[in-house]
């Protein structure tokens, strides 16, 4: 039904949005997820499907692909409506308090509350635009769907953040050789990841930047790197190049929706309330003092946002859902 009104609409179908949808089901809320991408999963699905995620309690290690699959299966427990390939561009509060959400394609959605779980917004990788990179469309990579294609190959990773280091470590056991190129010296990554990197077989080239791509017939065979301290150059043989130079994020029109924002997201209180009554935020969308930006923390914030939405609709409702082991939905 086009004018159907939902109790809560979750904008963003990444890990936090998916778990929030599961929890809203525990609270018997009619739920919709709207995601801008063709499928749910967020950045984890698109950029880290084969990376190992280790920052969720009780799960020592899981690939991004499997994490998303598990969260999607869990979210579907209570049959939320999931809408993909729609980017919400406008939110208006109607006279009766209902929110009208308008998508980029003109679709209209109605909801009594909204939970924003869009992460840092829509995203686009920073691509290597210079050095005739377009000549090597099959050798330059920004994400990976099948890591096995790099088995026994010489691979170069460029970047100095968590993503670059994670890829270097993920590729190291299967590639013939892995080089890591970083223009700086102090890696912008978790301390333990850096320690493991330095103890691995990955050959690290700090203070170096890629200055030339060499190959024929769309096949990359070598790269030249230049030391930004001495201006000396060296050539590295390679068959594949990973570029991890960050992403461009876009909050779109959210700045116009009326809530307070800061440098790192939408300002919320300890109940995940934004400055607009009825709109809540969680995960990387939200910011507050001493916030921890890991998936596990977002999985905690999602239920808080849902509980606040429930109380907004029903002030006398319980503060939180019955735990799943005692919830009526799971008792025979």
From Swiss-Prot:
Key word NADP present: yes
Sequence positions that bind FAD: 35, 43, 48, 88, 123, 284, 325
Listed cofactors: FAD
Record note on cofactor: Binds 1 FAD per subunit.
Source domain of life: Bacteria
UniProt keywords, alphabetically: FAD, Flavoprotein, NADP, Oxidoreductase
Entry EC no(s): 1.18.1.2
Gene3D superfamilies the UniProt entry points to: FAD/NAD(P)-binding domain
GO biological process: cell redox homeostasis
Pfam families: Pyr_redox_2 (PF07992)
Recorded GO MF terms: ferredoxin-NADP+ reductase activity; flavin adenine dinucleotide binding; NADP binding; thioredoxin-disulfide reductase (NADPH) activity
Disulfide bonds: none
Catalysed reaction, written as an equation: 2 reduced [2Fe-2S]-[ferredoxin] + NADP(+) + H(+) = 2 oxidized [2Fe-2S]-[ferredoxin] + NADPH
Family: Belongs to the ferredoxin--NADP reductase type 2 family.
Description of how the protein assembles with itself and partners: Homodimer.
Descriptive protein name: Ferredoxin--NADP reductase 1
């Amino acid at each position: 039904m086009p004018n159907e009104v939902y109790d809560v609409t979750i904008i963003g179908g990444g890990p936090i949005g998916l778990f929030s949808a599961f929890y809203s089901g525990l609270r018997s809320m009619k739920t919709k997820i709207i995601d801008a991408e063709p499928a749910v999963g967020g950045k984890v699905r698109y950029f880290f499907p084969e990376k190992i995620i280790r920052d969720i309690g009780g799960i020592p290690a899981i690939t991004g692909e499997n994490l998303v699959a598990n969260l999607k299966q869990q979210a579907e427990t209570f049959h939320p409506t999931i809408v993909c390939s729609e980017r919400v561009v406008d939110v208006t509060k109607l006279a009766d308090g209902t929110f009208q959400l308008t998508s980029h394609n003109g679709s209209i959605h109605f909801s009594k509350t909204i939970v924003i779980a869009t992460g840092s917004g829509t995203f686009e990788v920073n691509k290597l635009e210079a050095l005739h990179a377009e000549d090597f469309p099959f050798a330059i990579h920004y994400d990976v769907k099948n890591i096995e294609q790099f088995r026994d190959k010489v691979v170069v990773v460029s970047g100095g953040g968590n993503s670059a280091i994670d890829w270097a470590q993920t590729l190291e056991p299967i590639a013939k050789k892995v080089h890591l190129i970083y223009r700086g010296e102090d890696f912008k990554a978790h301390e333990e990841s850096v320690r493991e990197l330095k103890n691995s077989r990955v050959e690290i080239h700090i203070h170096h930047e890629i200055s030339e791509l060499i190959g024929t017939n769309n096949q990359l065979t070598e790269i030249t790197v230049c030391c930004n301290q001495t201006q000396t150059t060296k050539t590295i043989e390679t068959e594949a190049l990973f570029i991890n130079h960050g992403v461009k994020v876009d909050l779109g029109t959210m700045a116009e929706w009326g809530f307070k924002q800061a440098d790192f997201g939408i300002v919320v209180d300890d109940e995940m309330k934004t400055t607009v009554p009825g709109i809540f935020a969680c995960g990387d969308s939200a910011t507050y003092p001493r916030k921890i930006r890991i998936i596990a923390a977002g999985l905690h914030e999602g239920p808080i946002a849902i509980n606040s939405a429930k109380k907004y609709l029903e002030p006398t409702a319980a503060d939180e859902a019955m735990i799943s082991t005692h919830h009526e939905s799971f008792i025979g």
